Amino acid sequence: AVLPPEQPTFYQALRDSGYRVGIVGKTDLHKRDTYCGVKGDMPSMYHYGFTDPVETEGKMNSAWYGTNPDGSIYPMGPYQKYLMDKDPELMRTLEKDYRSYMRQKPRYYAQPSVLPDEVFLDTFIGEKSLEWLNEHDNTGAPWHLTVSFAGPHNPWDPPKEDYDAVGDTLWPDPIPNDMEGKPAWIRRRAAQQTGGMTQADLQQVKRCYAGSVRVIDRWIGKLLDWLETSGHKDDTIVIFCADHGELLGDHGLLEKSCMYEGCLRIPLLVHLPGMTQRRDSDALAELMDLAPTCLELAGADWNRREMDAVSLVPVLNGSTEPLRPVQRSELHNCTMLFDGRYKWIRSYNDTDELYDLETDPQELHNVINEHPEVLNRMRPYSFRH
């Protein structure tokens, strides 16, 4: 996907309100080609509103370098340049490893990284994030930094020390791949992704996924330590979230790009200065709500009428009033609607699904033909943006 250049962003609003706006890591805002330049796609980053971007490649693009006519190689992104400055053989080793992953049938990858921890991609992102904070700490301007780790996206290849630290933990069995009531495209994808995989294979996937999370957890700890030692713990808002989950074998699926809970139900944690008590909320939030939330908390100028999102500030202040009647998500040719109990997955060229998450949290029983009143109530929200 490409964020249209004419689309206003909340990063621009923060910039125009006097903030230094940074990002370190994978942006995923533009995918025109695999070559973003050894400093990242700076024109696009500036246009989107970042004043001080440190863009990196994602997991797979980090391995595809360029080759000169004489056979020598050159970097196509910032992380590749970092590896090649260290040792060109690091780049060749990573590329060879990932190409073997692409040839696997079924195509899944779960083993420790061939790179040492000190040059692992998420280690690079963590180190660059600390550099960014130290560089902008004394500028006199407020700052907003997005740290976008590449993991735990597949390939699941944590540093060996994190893989070993996870150990032979016995992970819960995946949700059964009972395909009754599931659309044909889900059945096809399940056969492609996990057909032929054993329970031992799935345990290995989860071990590597957990190791990938462990890397990120370690670096988040270092970033929080920086806030403590720099004296910014009490004047910094911290938000932790993910963009999606992974199925890791649930319903016979491994990755993302579906509307089941393993993909959609992601963590969202917010800490405000002065907050001393944990508070949980089951409000129907969406990722886009972080935009008005950040703007309101930052005191930036913004127009509520220009956003479909809603600010989470009332929830953070203890409000229990609903944010919205229905939560909505879209993907390719399907739309998901969720009212806090019922989830309706509208597949426009396939079987619709309705799950009662109160009685069926594993989404095993499609009750699409049993609750016409639920569909009638949610239908108007299908076409709202």
Q: Predicted regions: what is each one?
A:
Residues 1-347, 352, 361-380:
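Formylglycine-dependent sulfatase
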